[in-house]
Amino acid sequence: MSDKDVNPVSVDVEGNTPEDANKEILEKYDRESKTRNFDNRKLLAWIVAIVAIAYSIYHLWIQFNPIPALQQRSVHVAVGLALIFLIYPTFSKQNRTKIPFYDWIFFGLSFFTAIYIIMEYTAIVTERGGIPNNMDIAVGILAVLLVLEAARRVTGLILPIVALVFLAYPFFSHMDFLPMRLITREFDLGDIFGQLYLKTEGLYSTAIGASVNYIFLFILFGAFLTKSGLGQFFNDIAMALAGHRQGGPAKVAVVSSGFMGSINGAAVANVVSTGSFTIPLMKKIGYSKNFAGAVEASASVGGQVLPPIMGASAFIMAETTGINYGVIALAALVPAVLYYLAVIMQVHYRAGKRDLRGIPKADLPRVKEVMKERGHLLIPIVVLIGLLFQNMPVGHAAFWTIVTTVVVASFRKTTRMSINDILEALSMGARQSLAVVIACAVVGIIIGVVSLTSFGTVMTSSIQSLGAGSLFLTLFFTMLASMILGMGLPSIPAYIITATMAAPALAEFGVPVLVAHMFVFYFGIFANVTPPVALAAFAGAGVSGGNPMYTGFQALKLSLAGFIIPYLFVFEPSLLMINPEGLATNATEFPLADVGDIVLNVSTAVVGIIALSAALEGYFRTHLNVVLRLLLLAAALFSVVPGLTSDIIGLSVILVIFIINFMTDRKEKAQTA
């Protein structure tokens, strides 16, 4: 989702063809959706479907039939490349119903990059002693070029350009015109492309390892859940529970979009798909176009920090840090709940301020009927959580939850999956994974260069210099780096690049590995709602018909807690519920923080988040004047800052302001009675 150089324009979705309008919005703000269109009766569609289904089956098969990592990952990248050259046009305005001859050549060459490693594997690993021959170098160059071209088609120009900058460094790293700290030894083609192609520290790095073993399977799991109708369940149950309440449709959007965003991890696509249902309802009861689009964007983006599935970067975090994914998911729970509490409370206070009522109960589905019809679709998610907490390997857990989804969906006729549905889910999952596969492969180029040279150490020392010995300043500059990269790059490379540079710098201040990586993880994701480049918000504006930039700033306001929470868990790690000091690498245990600390800090954070939301909206029980808003904002920040003194001051001021506001509300109601 990195086609950042777009000129946001609203699209009217209230015409006769809303599906076409939504597709136009999606293609405008989500580069990944600009694919070729094949008639299902044509041979090309069958070829793509067969390759995609085989690709998914391969990932299921290797969970129980492991092969050497280099071979496993090379096949993962090669088939992903092959599918990209079939599905994505060379240029966006190119004829999308045909595949040009050169893409068939690229298709074949993509397979060749993996076939070569499989055929030459023994010689590469044992006979050559790590020294590549000319053929190794040639195929390595071919693989890198194919990856860069595929990335250009899927994500746009920015990611390949960043990779090329890193790739150029070892060619010039010995030259005197570079700053002294960047000068290192000379590298030849064998050094560079041997590192990138023949080792698991380049194209086939830990990022691709996470992609093949974790991310692909969870994307596939999401495809099966979508096919079973779980999205409809989330919409219906949210409507049944919250639709009739004050500002109901907006609360429905937050809940349903959050859960769906957690499953599919695609913020822009989720805004368009879920927003096409929730945004018209929000507008109908009186929310403005800009606010409606912003609510959908904030909720969809937050799904990537919401357990149990979260965004793809969380799996990269598990692979990079060696920490069990279940531990990471548990640690992410409280911060995610705090974030969604902030969004829901702002929605609630906006509704109170403008007297926006919910939908009549008679027009809403009933909870009992929704649970009876589709409630069983929650079972696979419960199974997944159970398997993760039983320390089952993540890939195996994903496999069994996919099987569980098919079995559970068969419980009712309305959700039962036919053979055709299963094949479509296999194909859909493969296609949806391509953007992640190519992003991880390009990240591998960056990781390979950093591993080969001293570039990572240089960047770490640069961040330390900027921080000037201050943890807060180091965190601040890390946040800026994450957000700037997140505006121009997909979340995976933004996370990897920033974590590579910043995590060691934060470690110098005693920040535990898990906490440092979670900090970086958050800001790379919330760049999607940060103007001037806020693609999720722009997509929300497209669906709502609002002003893209106004919607972007409104989404930023709604998501403000997401920019505060990472600082909170750095200074008070008990908000992660995990004791990071007792967390070893390859940890499979769940060393909980002190329960008293968890309860105290979570409680004060909840009060602070509610107060922050009231201050931002200028409303609690009734309107808040400017002075009370500013005092409440300051008190909210005091209450969430770790420390007993700050908690007492913040909570006391909040209590006084809420009492004043409550009494004002009673007085106003008495006067109008």
Predicted regions and their residues:
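Hydrophobic transmembrane alpha-helices that form the pore/transport pathway of multi-pass ion
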Residues: 235-303, 309, 313, 322, ...
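Long, contiguous bundles of hydrophobic transmembrane helices that form the permeation core
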Residues: 5-45, 330-432, 535-637, 665-673
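Structural signature of hydrophobic alpha-helical transmembrane segments
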Residues: 70-81, 128-140, 331-338, 398, ...
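Conserved, well-structured core domains of diverse proteins
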Residues: 1-130, 137-141
